[in-house]
């Protein structure tokens, strides 16, 4: 599957739903999509096409999606890729986004457009998650697994780049600290795994699923009851409640978006 503007928007809408409240808004994803299409070509491959020993790397954006002081430049995508290749023992065959989300599903797209490395029709996790450990595909439970993470971001005096190796939790904490220093978030490559491990532990096919949801979403635009019925049929969902959001509280703390909302139901 080759990324186009139409396909990209379908993926963004579906990923916004699958993100489950995390992963940013489609507006942010659309800005990335436009930039990616102007930069190069992005092709999605099925992980089944890879040999068991080929290496997959995760692309992520770590930090606060609500930040207004963050800055990710094209050079940062190239830097994290070069640093990762310099420190990883095997060549990379594909890149995968860490999670669905209106913005986060685009993680890896710019890197793919710049380097030609294919994206996979998959994600580490089937929904958005706030910590690196949650999106580590169980690697944190493997005693001898050594995580490799490279991160870059920020502008002017806030610009920062790091390479970290160690446990999944330890390196993830280092990246989170870098996101705070960068003013909100950093672009990250992390946790190389074989295709064999990935097939058994990742959310394979979720990009195609997101696209399908996005197509139905567009067809039902403005007709909420029809959209809800379609989503329930597609995903075997249960509607827990419906009503107006009466209050929202959103704060940025330690590189996280932390918030609550109040839903008034009948």
Q: How should these model regions be labeled?
A:
Residues 21:
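Extended, polar beta-sheet/loop recognition surfaces of beta-rich domains
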Residues 2-15, 27-266:
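Non-transmembrane, aqueous-exposed alpha-helical and coiled segments at domain scale
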């Amino acid at each position: 599957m080759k990324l186009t503007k139409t396909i990209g928007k379908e993926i963004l809408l579906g990923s916004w739903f699958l993100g489950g409240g995390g992963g940013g808004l489609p507006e942010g994803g659309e800005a990335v999509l436009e930039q990616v299409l102007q930069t190069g070509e992005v092709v999605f491959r099925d992980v089944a096409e890879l040999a068991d020993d080929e290496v997959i790397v995760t692309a992520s954006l770590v930090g606060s999606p609500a930040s207004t002081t963050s800055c990710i430049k094209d050079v940062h995508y190239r830097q994290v890729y070069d640093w990762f290749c310099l420190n990883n023992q095997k060549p990379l065959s594909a890149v995968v986004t860490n999670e669905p989300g209106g913005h986060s599903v685009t993680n890896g797209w710019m890197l793919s457009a710049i380097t030609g490395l294919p994206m996979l029709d998959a994600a580490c996790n089937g929904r958005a998650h706030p910590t690196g450990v949650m999106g580590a595909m169980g690697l944190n439970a493997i005693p001898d697994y050594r995580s490799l993470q490279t991160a870059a971001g920020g502008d002017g005096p806030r610009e920062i780049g790091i390479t970290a190796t160690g446990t999944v939790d330890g390196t993830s904490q280092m990246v989170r600290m870098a996101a705070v220093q960068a003013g909100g978030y950093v672009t990250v490559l992390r946790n190389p795994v074989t295709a064999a491990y990935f097939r058994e532990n990742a959310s394979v096919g979720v990009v195609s699923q997101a696209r399908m949801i996005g197509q139905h979403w567009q067809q039902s635009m403005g007709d909420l009851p029809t959209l809800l019925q379609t989503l329930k049929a597609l995903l075997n969902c249960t509607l827990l409640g419906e009503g107006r959001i009466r209050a929202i509280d959103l704060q940025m703390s330690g590189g996280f978006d932390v918030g609550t909302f109040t839903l008034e139901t009948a």
